[in-house]
Amino acid sequence: MNQARGFTLIELMVVIMLIAAAYVLVPRYLFSGVSGADLKASSRDIAAGLRMARAEAVNTRRDTSLTLDMEKRTFTINGAQTRKLPELLEMKLVTAQSEVVNQSQASIRFFPDGSSTGGRVTVASGERKYEVDVDWLTGRVTIAQ
């Protein structure tokens, strides 16, 4: 008798299931963290918040602060508008010592003339990072990769 060689339907289904499981699970372990697009969007959100705080200080002729909470991954402008950032985002803020609230919270303050306390917010995920700089003299906000 001549038997046909090949795979059974069950064997093929098992292989397909294993491939599907690998397709779903492997990217989580290889690419954990924030995507490049989310990282860039987060840096732009922070920059926009800083620019909004500066504009508010100039328009209202009152000091305005943007406060970052590195633990909760949020920032607020004068304690009113809270914006949430991705959980896996790594954040670091360098600012004037007078603006440090505690270990996880600090602010960048803008003055009515447009100047600020200055600082740098670094948002990162793994090796990728963006730096949002605030010039203390002019209050100008820039993003660098």
Task: Give the residues covered by each predicted segment.
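N-terminal leader/signal peptides at the extreme start of proteins
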Residues: M1-F7
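Residues within the helices of the helix-turn-helix
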Residues: I10
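N-terminal helix-rich module
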Residues: N2, M13, A21, L25-R51, ...
